[in-house]
Amino acid sequence: MARLVIVSNRVAIPEEGGKAVAAGGLAVAVKEAFTAYEGLWFGWSGTISEEPSEEPTLIDRGRVQYAVVDLSPQDHLEYYAGFANRALWPIMHYRLGLGAFSRSDYAGYSRVNRTFARALAKLVEPDDIIWVHDYHLLPLAAELRGLGLDNPIGYFHHIPWPAADVFNSLPASGELLRAIVDYDLIGLQTEADVQNLQRNLVDTQRAIPLGGGSLMVDGRRTRIRAFPIGIDVAGFKEAAEKANANKVVRETIAGLRTRKLLIGVDRLDYSKGVPER
């Protein structure tokens, strides 16, 4: 029976007894996917270790098995803090002036993706469907293909995909574009993001449009579509209804009178527009 194999930078492992995972967008999306499939969730443990092993630690929680690996201090510095968050994150959010490219950071980013691929390949079964998440892992499919895996591999990009002139300001842009077409299906948040990536592949990688979001690049076919992530409407509705029973909530609402109160919960990051709000 086919399993769903999720790969992300971090893994949200529920506590024994089924306590819910974190409420971030990626964690919620993955949790919903596992309601329909048995599967495996692979990624970084969140631990920095001086001598990390490539053999993942396996943790079983009902229908889902979690597989995590540690990162070395150098890997964390170059792959995560470096290329992913000092180069890709600002570029993807159109903040070129805040981006910083380092060859050593990019080497670390590539190295960790290669390490992840080697560790994951040992766990993947022939019928598994692999679904990779977010900008930390753009080259992962290419690394897996290089190890001989021909499983269906999809990718979902949780943040914006910028216009070609912005993305191509990154010195490694060509390598990343060539790597991303090793995914069979690429999911983005908006139609504008889809157009940005498709045009870039056509203009710089000689991709041939086939219709329906499909492209042929160097003999390989990939499909790019918009799949915007929503929220758990039923869950939010239930939480709001339960909140009315809370005395503090009732007093707050009464104190507002005719005014409206909007509450946002965000990291203190320039991409969140906190000062503007």
Where are these regions (language model features)?
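Catalytic cores of carbohydrate-active enzymes across secretory and cytosolic contexts
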Residues: 1-276
